[in-house]
Amino acid sequence: MAYWQREVLRSGTSMTFNQTYELDLPKSGWLASLVLYMRSTDTGAGFLTAVKWRLIDYISKIEVIGDGSEIIKSYDGRQALASFFYDTGREPVSMWRHYSNTPHRQWVPILFGRYCFDEQFGLDLSRFNQVTLKITNIATATEF
């Protein structure tokens, strides 16, 4: 049985509206999965007329890129949730409501193996000089 190190790479980091957030991942090690936890509070009337009312609907792209150009994983927010569901048969934890001034929360697991703590399959970070996580959102101050 392998020893799994659980590490929080960033906590309490804010994303700017309609921007891409980038995070450089460790240079070595074995990565079986990433779990992104996102939360926000909507504005008073932002979601009352919105077609997109879940937090995940405002994530237009989640990418894991190796050496600046090799795409390892690339999803929009809904595809990331669907991929986890197809792999595990479970829906990721979320909390969203369709009324004003409500906190929205979303867990987005990204698997590099067959499941979260897969000991056989995953991403060997030492194969790349640099691995970057990029999260692009399309939210505006009107909604959040």
Predicted regions and their residues:
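Short, low-complexity Pro/Thr/Gly
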Residues: 1-144
